[in-house]
Amino acid sequence: KELCPYLSRLLKYGDATGPITLKSNSNYNTSIVEPTTPTRILMNFDRTCNYKCPSCRVDLIVEDSNGIKRIEKTIEEIDTYYSPNVKTLYITGSGDPFVSVGFRNYLRNFNPTKYPKLTRIHFHTNASMWTKKMWDSMPNVHKYVTTCEISIDAGTRDTYENKTRLGGKWDTLINNLNFISTIKTLQWVKTSFVVQDSNYMEMETFYNLMYS
């Protein structure tokens, strides 16, 4: 009764009857352990965004000063300990890279010499702040940004502004998409559409818009 039922029974060996002990290093095949740090880093540790999309959150999420310090500390650790072997940076699966203070500063002050093996930076964004002015403020990342995903979730202004991308402006989206289409380093651009009760009738409209 004093033991956790999930931990007291081992799948392979049955009930645990003795003390938990550490094996010596000689019991492990160390030759299969990679001595390097990760080559792909998903930077999804800031949920800051200027939208409150029903498919993602019910309120605006913006980091306060303490949160920004925590995020900047994590970025500093990546810069210091992991950057030499990184080949791909994914920014970000949790919020928006251009809205986040920490990520925005990181991109504006990006030092390529710390990332000698880097070949790709992937942006996941709502594109609301991906303007020419923003892009020009981070020149050191340009050659690495070869792919991106832009979340849209609508085929019309009304659905975009009032149902699926709350806080967004349709005209801003269209203008920024037109600019993004001129970025020569981008090899492919993915636009995403999360199907919901409020937008499923616009899937074809969205498809035609993306290819117009």
Predicted regions, residues:
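Alpha-helical packing segments of well-folded alpha/beta enzyme cores
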Residues: 1, 41, 78, 85, ...
